[in-house]
Structure formats: structure tokens, C-alpha cells
Regions:
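Bacterial signal peptide processing site
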Residues: 24-27
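C-terminal motif of bacterial Sec signal peptides marking the signal peptidase cleavage site
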Residues: 18-22
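Bacterial N-terminal signal peptides that target proteins for export
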Residues: 1-10
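Mature N-terminal segment immediately following signal peptide/propeptide cleavage
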Residues: 53-64
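Active-site-surrounding "flap" and adjacent substrate/cofactor-binding loops of secreted or lumenal enzymes
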Residues: 89-123
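Post-signal peptide N-terminal segment of mature Sec-exported envelope proteins
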Residues: 33-50
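Non-catalytic, conformational "gating/processing" segments within enzyme and secreted inhibitor domains
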Residues: 110, 116-222
Length: 222
């Protein structure tokens, strides 16, 4: 990845600012560069969920190693998968291969991963009437930055990503992103960004998850 990138992870919101060559310029599609060793159609949605869920352990370990000792933290492997799903179908060649490796889906086409995530996002919020779950995605594009329409449309159609175009490195955008995070997390995350994004930021992908449920085994309050 030759372009400058920003990767920030805080609690259950995942943000990535990036510039990838496949999102701009020619219409070369990542799918044309993929050469799965087995027919990707044989992968069921369940297979894809299992593959991506296996990233939770190394993800937790990586975050845990960077967190202050004895300090509580929370991560969302699902949130990471949502963002990487938006990301991978806009990447080519080595970049796409690296993202697929992180997702543990090296032989699965991005289009099939997106279909699986769409199905999961449709199902999970309605899976349990006693549990509240909201999943939100958004893509923020720097004003004047040329992003392929197909890429934008796929994120909208498959992952219901809100799409906003504005100058990203401004105080206004920082406030807008923080407001978005606050709305989508029911006010639990209000100050995701402490300062404006860097001037070389061209695109931001965001995922937010809000969950409220009852513990099957409650903690001792003491």
C-alpha cells in the first residue's frame, strides 16, 4: 500500500482512512485478479462467518498488547470485519491479498463476503426480541477525490453505508464524525476523534455497533 493511511480503532467503532488505487482510475476489478483454488460458490454464509470469526483471537491479542496493564477495553471483531469487507472489494493484488489474509478468507471472493455480511446484518438485529442491536456503516469521501461509483454503490447496497462527501481535514468534519458515532452508539461514544483528520486523508470508512442485552450469568457486583 503506497498511499498514506490512517488506521484508528476505539472500542466498538472502527475507522479507516485510506487511498487505494482500485477505488480510482481504471475499471480493473479485484475480482478479475482473484484465482480461488476451489469454487467460491461452495462456501456457504456459515463458512464465511466461521472463517472471519476466527480473526477475533489474534485481534484481541494485538489490541491487548497495546493497552495499559489492568485497564479494561472492548473490541468488536464484527465491526472490524464490516470495515474490512468494505475495504477489500476496493483493493487490488497484494493489498487485497493482505486484507484477505487478515480476514482469514484468502480463497473467498469479496463479492461473496459482502453478500454474507449483508445477510448477517439483516438477520442479527431481529434475532432476539429481548436484545437491542444496531449495526451502522458509513463512508466519508474527501471533496474532489475521485472514487469509483461501483465501489460506493456496493457499500451502499450491500452494507447500507451512509455516504458523505466533504472536506475531511476540517473541524466541521471531525464534529460530524463524532456526531455520527454518538447517534449510532446511542450516545456511548461521543468523542471518537479528538482532533481533525490529517490533510492527506482521502476516505474514511466507519462502522458502529450498539448492543444491549441481559447477561446469562451476571457478574457479582462486589
Amino acid at each position: 500500500m503506497k498511499r498514506n493511511k490512517i488506521f484508528t480503532l476505539i472500542l466498538i467503532v472502527v475507522s479507516m482512512a485510506m487511498g487505494f488505487s482500485s477505488c480510482i482510475g481504471n475499471d480493473d476489478d479485484y475480482n478479475n485478479n482473484q484465482k480461488p483454488t476451489i469454487d467460491p460458490v461452495t462456501y456457504s454464509y456459515k463458512d464465511i462467518y466461521l472463517q472471519t470469526s476466527m480473526t477475533a483471537y489474534p485481534f484481541f491479542s494485538q489490541v491487548n498488547s497495546s493497552v495499559e496493564k489492568n485497564k479494561n477495553f472492548m473490541i468488536s471483531p464484527l465491526g472490524m470485519t464490516e470495515v474490512l469487507t468494505m475495504l477489500v472489494h476496493g483493493a487490488n493484488e497484494n493489498t487485497a491479498a493482505q486484507i484477505n489474509k487478515v480476514m482469514n478468507t484468502p480463497w473467498i471472493l469479496p463479492a461473496h463476503i459482502m453478500d454474507a455480511m449483508k445477510s448477517l446484518n439483516d438477520f442479527l438485529p431481529k434475532a432476539d426480541s429481548k436484545t437491542a442491536l444496531a449495526i451502522a456503516n458509513s463512508q466519508w469521501i474527501d471533496e474532489g477525490y475521485d472514487v469509483k461509483n461501483d465501489y460506493i454503490k456496493n457499500n451502499i447496497d450491500k452494507l447500507d453505508a451512509e455516504t458523505l462527501t466533504q472536506l475531511l481535514s476540517t473541524e466541521t468534519t471531525k464534529d460530524d464524525i463524532n456526531s455520527w458515532c454518538a447517534r449510532k452508539t446511542n450516545g456511548l461514544i461521543k468523542d471518537f476523534l479528538k482532533s481533525p483528520l490529517q490533510q492527506n486523508t482521502r476516505m474514511v470508512l466507519l462502522n458502529a455497533l450498539y448492543f444491549k442485552g441481559q447477561w446469562k450469568y451476571k457478574f457479582d457486583k462486589k
